[in-house]
Amino acid sequence: MARKPKESSTVDFETTLNQLETIVTRLEAGDLPLEEALKEFENGIKLAKLGQERLQQAEQRIQILLQKSDTAELTDYQPTDE
């Protein structure tokens, strides 16, 4: 049976990507009846759009953070040995 994507407000990017990969795998196997394949494809399109939205939101957040710290000097990350 086709899986429906969860509500966009509760699903993170990684979960969306995993669900999309599962759908792609099922479609590539070619074992689904036509109607189920169409439902999976439709869900895949929704998940792809949701993933794109998540990436755009992350990019916007990064741009805002970079603008706020425009005067701050960036330094390389130095991990601490613990």
Curated annotation (Swiss-Prot):
Provide the GO biological process annotations. DNA catabolic process
Q: Does the keyword Nuclease apply?
A: yes
List the EC numbers from the record: 3.1.11.6
Q: Which SUPFAM superfamilies match?
A: XseB-like (SSF116842)
What's one Pfam family the UniProt record gives for this protein?
Exonuc_VII_S
- Which locations, inside or outside the cell, does it occupy? Cytoplasm
User: NCBIfam families annotated for this entry?
Assistant: PRK00977.1-1, PRK00977.1-4, xseB
- So what does this one do? Bidirectionally degrades single-stranded DNA into large acid-insoluble oligonucleotides, which are then degraded further into small acid-soluble oligonucleotides.
Recorded protein name is Exodeoxyribonuclease 7 small subunit
**Lineage of producing organism:** Bacteria, Pseudomonadati, Pseudomonadota, Gammaproteobacteria, Pasteurellales
